[in-house]
């Protein structure tokens, strides 16, 4: 059963960029971001009610989760949707893999007790090299399509940097308050949905053209990829531990690239998978995953985050 959940999480998170790309065929970027967040929040609220979990009452928990909702949900989901107007979904899924690198950088800046060791610095440098390979600066001036995608690629780095800030906030303040991860994630997504609905009349404007493809894509992106996948991953982390569960990070770009190339017919430049592999190698080095496996037979990486969204796990 846990192996099935692992595959489901990899497929749902890996396909998030694919479904967002389809959603953009009939919705504006901020509309895609708002709909996915609202559907994800509603799905988790149903899970919370069915399982009879209680809502937090402490103001401190709600206050910190409001900050988390901004940096782990509202901002990254908006940047992701905006970026995919010009960036292929497969390449966007590869950029999502830079999240652990950004998290280490944010921890070093925002959490006084966190100090980068040589291994982590080496992993970060390797990750930066991977990003440069992904961008392909040798093609920027010679290919108008690549040049047009540069702002979107920068936005995707902003997305993962936002993850890093949010996760560093969690590490510094420990906002879980003793509540289980599903409850915390439900509050987090509900707050994010509320924020995005408030600003929707101003930023989520534009014509809406719906068909079965777009509706299905948004349900898959919101209810499944942003809602149910949270519950699945929570159970997986509980059964396997965060280190082993985090290896899904290595599969989601594979799913994203495969869907983009095979289904959407997106071009794949040689430097994109190469850069992605360099980034993943940097993550493995910085997180100590390879060394931990040699010593203990299990990973020591942080729990993964879905594409364009992230969740708070208790006092993480």
PLM regions: where:
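Transmembrane alpha-helices of multi-pass small-molecule transport proteins
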Residues: 26-75, 100-107, 162-166, 185-204, ...
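C-terminal transmembrane-helix exit sites in multi-pass transporters
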Residues: 51, 55, 100-125, 254-274
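Specific transmembrane alpha-helical segments of multi-pass solute transporters/efflux pumps
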Residues: 12-20, 45-96, 129-133, 222-240
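Hydrophobic transmembrane alpha-helices of multi-pass small-molecule transport proteins
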Residues: 44, 66, 105-106, 119-139, ...
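Helix-helix packing/entry segments at the starts of transmembrane helices
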Residues: 35, 73, 91-98, 169-193, ...
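C-terminal-most transmembrane helix of multi-pass membrane proteins
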Residues: 31, 36-38, 213-214, 250-316
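Membrane-interface interhelical linkers
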Residues: 1-8, 41-68, 113-122, 139-151, ...
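Hydrophobic/aromatic residues within transmembrane alpha-helices
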Residues: 23, 32, 36, 83, ...
